[in-house]
Amino acid sequence: MLSVILKESVRNLGKAGMVLKVKPGYARYLLTQKKAVRATKENLKSLEEQYLFIEKENLEKLEAAKVLKASLEDEFLIITRQAADDGKLFGSVTPKCISKLLSDKGYNIHYRNIFFYSVIKYIGEYVVNLELHPDLVLPITLYVVKNDLGAMQAQKLHAEKKRKIEEGKVEKGSCTEGESLELGSVDNDINSGNVDSNESEKQDSVSE
């Protein structure tokens, strides 16, 4: 175990300024992402002074996260996966998959800052949560489809939902997790391909 001082609050770990012992692999992640510094004698001695700097840096990161949030708010993701006739996926969708999709769009978000409220097991519509900052989490829509035709229909579905949101007919983020395949013929068509967290985090940790 390695001792570190958190430079910012980290979900499920601790608040900025805390001195914690973490596993070497996780310590490397925290240090590389500049979320922590080593808890050396010098750093511990100047912790109070460091804390003032940490607070200032944390506020700057929060402002940067707000800018990123503004650019991401209209984004949605589509991922293609093989599935059985009932829509059950043969593979899996993990935070690393989402991180790659976002990277392809020009957004650098580490997979550890991506989480789901439920495991993605079926074709359909889901909500993915992006932790842009410990105090700022942005939910975005993910469509899991079987083929290009399904991707086209997902784009059409999202455009229709956006129109209804703008007209005030539905609330933003109104997708119910795990029920997207039961919303009607459009999602059923995505499931069939005729038209157009958690367990996932455990899978990612094993693959490291």
From Swiss-Prot:
Q: Tell me the protein's name.
A: Large ribosomal subunit protein bL9
> Which PANTHER family has this protein been placed in?
50S RIBOSOMAL PROTEIN L9
Alphabetically sorted, this entry's keywords are: Ribonucleoprotein, Ribosomal protein, RNA-binding, rRNA-binding
Is rRNA-binding a UniProt keyword of this protein? yes
Q: What does this protein do?
A: Binds to the 23S rRNA.
Q: Which domain of life is it from?
A: Bacteria
Q: Which NCBIfam families match?
A: L9
A single GO molecular-function term is: structural constituent of ribosome
